[in-house]
């Protein structure tokens, strides 16, 4: 789950504004388990409504339901996820070591949740990262230094246009900065050390983890 990132997502739903999404998420996160569990679901809320009864599909296969997660960026959201008993999804838009305080906020809140959303606590953090792992170490590093990899950042800047970005941030379709410079082994090592990427052979990647 999440509040949405960028006008491409938010404006699709009747012009939803970023300032509205926190309250809307608070409403919907508690309703998702009910949608899974009930065949005669209805809801009347401040941000949205389902005049009922409706059988919301699809439903989880078998007993129970999947773990519930929320995409997190700031410390408050990490702590809120922990307090609600749901998992936190983190992204490496900055050096991965900077997330230490946010992970601690999550774990502290998860130790004594004020509420459990759903049937069970999902006390986990999932963190995304770029990974290039090959038996051939040099080939993995060659791919990591390729110019095309930089297009990921330009796409993030395009679609996540409601998030702050650096003044020198480049947005697609403009060519990424990586096409203007020749990546060196030293530069790649700095990226790996900062936690922006895992790269190398299986032994190296395991060590980086």
Segments from the language model and where they lie:
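Hydrophobic faces of well-ordered beta-strands that scaffold small-molecule active sites
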Residues: 1-3, 68-71, 86-91, 123-129
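Short intrinsically disordered, low-complexity coil segments enriched in acidic
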Residues: 1-7, 206-209
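Glycine-rich beta-alpha junction loops
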Residues: 5-7, 72-74, 93-96, 129-135
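Acidic/polar active-site rim loop that often engages polyanionic ligands
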Residues: 6-16, 83-85
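An alpha-helical appendage that flanks or caps ligand/catalytic pockets
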Residues: 19-57, 97-209
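A local structural motif
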Residues: 61-67
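A conserved active-site cap/scaffold subdomain adjacent to cofactor or substrate pockets
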Residues: 73-103
């Amino acid at each position: 789950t999440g509040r949405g990132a960028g006008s491409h997502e938010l404006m699709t739903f009747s012009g939803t504004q970023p300032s509205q999404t926190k309250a809307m998420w608070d409403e919907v996160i508690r309703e998702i388990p009910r949608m899974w569990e009930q065949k005669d679901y209805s809801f009347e809320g401040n941000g949205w409504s389902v005049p009922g009864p409706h059988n919301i599909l699809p439903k989880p296969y078998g007993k129970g339901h999947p773990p519930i997660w929320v995409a997190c960026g700031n410390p408050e959201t990490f702590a809120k996820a922990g307090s609600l008993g749901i998992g936190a999804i983190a992204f490496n838009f900055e050096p991965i070591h900077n997330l230490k305080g946010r992970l601690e906020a999550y774990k502290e809140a998860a130790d004594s949740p004020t509420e459990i959303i759903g049937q069970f606590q999902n006390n986990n953090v999932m963190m995304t990262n770029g990974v290039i792992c090959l038996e051939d170490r040099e080939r993995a590093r060659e791919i990591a230094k390729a110019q095309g990899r930089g297009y990921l950042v330009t796409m993030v800047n395009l679609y996540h246009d409601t998030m702050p970005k650096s003044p020198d941030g480049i947005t697609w379709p403009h060519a990424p900065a990586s096409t203007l410079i020749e990546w060196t082994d030293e530069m790649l090592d700095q990226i790996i050390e900062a936690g922006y990427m895992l790269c190398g052979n299986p032994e190296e990647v395991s060590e980086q983890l």
